[in-house]
Regions:
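Short hydrophobic beta-strand element within catalytic cores of glycosyltransferases
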Residues: 281-284
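Conserved acidic donor-binding segment of nucleotide-sugar-dependent glycosyltransferases
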Residues: 286, 295-297, 301-308, 317-322, ...
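Nucleotide-activated donor-binding/catalytic signature segment of Leloir-type glycosyltransferases, i.e.
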Residues: 228-244
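A conserved mid-protein helix/loop that constitutes part of the nucleotide-sugar donor-binding site
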Residues: 16-21, 182, 186-208, 222-229, ...
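Aromatic "clamp/platform" in nucleotide-sugar-dependent glycosyltransferases that forms part
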Residues: 245, 264
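N-terminal strand-loop element at the rim of the active site
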Residues: 5-13, 17-65, 149-151, 159
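Short His-centered aromatic/hydrophobic patch
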Residues: 88-95, 110
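Acidic anion/phosphate-binding donor-loop and adjacent secondary structure
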Residues: 63-64, 118, 146-150, 161-180
C-alpha cells in the first residue's frame, strides 16, 4: 500500500516519535510510506530510512477564511503528490479536509485526552464533519472511546496504545546534567498540562530528607521562567536542574532512580513507557495513560489527581528504599510485552487494509 502519514511538524514530542516509529514499522512490513509535515519548523527528530518526506509549507499563523482555504489547498497539493491509498493523521484534523476532497480514505489518531479538547461551536461542527467521514478514529484509552462515542459511531473507533520499545543493552556514559548520586527524573514540555509546579511543591516537602538526591526536569516551554522562579520561592533551586529538551534520553533512563509524572492530563505518554522499559520505577498522578501503564504497587505508584502531599509521600517511599526501587524497576520492564511495537504496527496496518475496502 501507499500510505501517507501526516503530522503538523517533527518538533520534539511524544506523538512525533510515535509517528516515526509507526512509519519505520510500516516500511518494515513492505509498504511505501510518505511522511507529510504541514508546517515549516526545525526538525527535532530524523526521518527513518525508507520513508519519503514531503513538506506542505503552510503558515499556521495565517488567519481568516482565505488563509484557511489556502492551507487546505497547499495540503491537498502536497497530499496529491504522494498518491496515497490511505492517509493516517496524528493530531492534525483540518488537513483531512484535503483527503476528503481527494476522496482518499483517512484514519485520524488523537494523541490527547479527548475530553480535554476545548473548541468553539463552529470548530466543533467542523471537527465532527471530518470525524464522521473518517474510515477510523484512533484514541489512546477506552475512556476516550466512550467519550467520543457521543458524537461518533463506536464501531468506527479503535483503541491503540502507544508502544514500548526495549532499550539497547549497552552501557552509556552518565548524563552530564545528572550531578548528584541519585536522580528523580521528570520529562515533558514546560506547560500547565504537565503540572511541574505541583512537582516542585511536592519536592519541597521531602527534599531536606534527601541530601544526595536531585530533581532533574527535562524539557522546554512557556512555563520555564515561572517554574525557575517558583523553585527559588520554594527555596529548592539548589536541588533542582532545568535541562533543555534532549533528542535521546536513553542515558537518562539508564541512570535515573525514579521517574515522576505530575500531569493534569495525558494521552499515552511515551516518556513513561520508555523509562519503565529501561527499568525505572514511576510515580504519577492518576490520569489517562499512566493509569493503564503503571500497575499501582507493582511497578510504580498512582496518586489521586492533585494530591501533592501523597505524591511527595510515594516519591519518598521509593527514594528511601533501594530494594523496592529495584523490585518495581524489574517488573516495570514488562511494559515491552504488554505494549509491544509489533502489535502496535500490526493494528494500524489492519486499519489501513480495512479502510481501502
Amino acid at each position: 500500500m501507499n500510505i501517507t502519514c501526516i503530522i503538523p511538524t517533527l518538533g520534539g514530542g511524544g506523538a512525533e516519535r510515535v509517528m516515526l516509529q509507526l512509519c519505520a514499522g510500516l516500511v518494515g512490513r513492505g509498504h511505501r510510506i510518505t511522511l507529510l509535515t504541514l508546517y515549516d519548523a526545525p526538525d527535532f527528530y530524523t526521518v527513518p530510512p525508507g520513508v519519503e518526506r514531503v513538506q506542505a509549507h503552510a503558515d499556521p499563523q495565517a488567519q481568516g477564511m482565505w488563509a484557511r482555504l489556502k492551507r487546505v489547498w497547499l495540503w491537498r497539493r502536497a497530499m496529491k503528490r504522494t498518491r496515497p491509498d490511505v492517509v493516517i493523521s496524528f493530531m492534525a484534523l483540518g488537513v483531512l479536509a484535503a483527503a476528503w476532497l481527494l476522496r482518499v480514505p483517512y484514519i485520524f489518531a488523537e494523541h490527547l485526552d479527548v475530553s480535554k479538547v476545548r473548541l468553539s461551536r463552529q470548530w466543533l461542527k467542523w471537527r465532527l464533519f471530518l470525524l464522521n467521514r473518517a474510515a477510523r478514529v484512533v484514541v489512546l484509552s477506552w475512556r476516550d472511546k466512550a467519550y467520543i462515542a457521543r458524537h461518533y459511531p463506536r464501531w468506527k473507533t479503535s483503541v491503540i496504545y502507544n508502544p514500548a520499545f526495549a532499550p539497547q543493552q549497552r552501557q552509556l556514559p552518565r548524563p552530564p546534567y545528572f550531578t548528584a548520586p541519585h536522580t528523580v527524573l521528570a520529562v515533558g514540555r514546560l506547560t500547565r498540562q504537565k503540572g511541574f509546579e505541583r512537582l516542585l511543591e511536592a519536592w519541597q516537602l521531602i527534599q531536606p530528607r534527601f541530601a544526595n538526591w536531585r530533581l532533574c526536569i527535562v524539557g522546554g516551554g512557556e512555563e520555564k521562567e515561572n517554574l525557575i522562579s517558583l523553585a527559588e520561592t520554594l527555596d529548592v533551586q539548589g536541588s533542582v536542574s532545568f535541562v533543555p529538551p534532549q533528542k535521546d534520553l536513553c542515558a537518562a533512563y539508564q541512570y535515573a532512580d525514579l521517574l515522576v509524572m505530575s500531569s493534569r492530563f495525558e494521552g499515552f505518554p511515551l516518556v513513561l513507557l520508555e523509562a519503565m522499559a529501561a527499568g525505572v520505577p514511576a510515580v504519577s498522578f492518576v490520569c489517562n495513560g499512566p493509569d493503564v501503564i503503571i500497575r499501582d504497587g507493582t511497578d510504580g505508584f498512582l496518586v489521586p489527581q492533585g494530591n501533592t502531599d501523597l505524591l511527595a509521600e510515594k516519591m519518598a517511599q521509593l527514594m528511601q528504599d533501594e530494594s523496592l526501587r529495584q523490585a518495581f524497576g524489574s517488573r516495570a520492564r514488562e511494559v515491552c510485552g504488554r505494549f509491544s511495537p509489533e502489535h502496535f504496527v500490526q493494528e494500524y496496518e489492519q486499519l489501513c487494509l480495512a479502510a481501502r475496502k
